[in-house]
């Protein structure tokens, strides 16, 4: 506690313009693709506006508390987030499961992550399932977002093409957040084409909605198990690796326990989980945020505080995004996930030893099949592991 208070007292002196802008940039990125994905998942799950606002409230506030307190405690730029791969999984899962079943999956997944942190078996658990198989499942889960980006071309070609051009031009010039430029150009084109609805906004605090869980074997296997694996492998593992590569000691077990506890508390209010950031972690941890490594924690504090403030206005956020054309939201989600789709596909297929197992997992996950009411990600994971074990035995 003394270290936390000391770092809090040092915050005004340690904060620099570069750390401030890095923290705000992380928030801006999270306001683009990830929020668009939540809104898509909410549509699939037939959430009303209050339920969607509650989901955003739980995600934003939980992520903010995670990053704020851990950054202050360890003087490390730890960035909180919700798992975008997990939200992508929910978009397929909510079509086959009730809201109450999804909440039960959130609770079980959070409890499992807490258990992993308490026991310290994080790395051992990651070694049980081959990483290429998990990456193939992730690529399969995200695949439809990339496809949907181009499905929107006939519907609204001007917006989609403008956003694509903005994204790749920004990438070409090395901008840190190309998806933000896509959003700005997409908004400009939508305004020019008069496709933005007139907002009827009321600035009010979010009103969290409580949902009682309903446990089922199907939701445990199709949602809870993949959610846990995706969160550990695509959020905590790369997020902690970013901190290690930046020269910081990584409080992995503490982060797992704290993130799992926040996820557990937010689950009944439709929060899909809180964890360390992966994609945006490098923005706060690198020298671009602040040359002095001992001051970079302020980027995590700024990000956490801003997350909390935005989360409290969850209903307003839903109203703002509700004014935008569906093509813009779909393009935003797809563009935001392009790097993740590319890297997960590459990681799954680059090692010849695991390539066949990864292909089985990828194709099965993309297929969308759900025999026995169990979703395609579960069957893809199961088939991929089985294929790997059979191939390993044959080689032996």
Language model feature labels by segment:
Residues 89-90, 166, 185, 242, ...:
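Buried hydrophobic packing segments
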Residues 43, 127, 244, 267, ...:
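Short polybasic/polar patches that bind polyanions
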Residues 32-33, 158, 234, 276, ...:
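Residue-level signal for transmembrane alpha-helical positions in Major Facilitator Superfamily
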Residues 55-57, 82, 153, 167, ...:
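Tryptophan-centered motif/residue detector
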Residues 95-201, 302-396:
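Membrane-embedded alpha-helical modules
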Residues 2-13, 19-38, 57-138, 250-338:
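Helix-loop-helix junctions within the multi-pass membrane cores of secondary transporters/permeases
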Residues 171-176, 247-248, 290-292:
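Membrane-interface helix-boundary motifs at transmembrane edges
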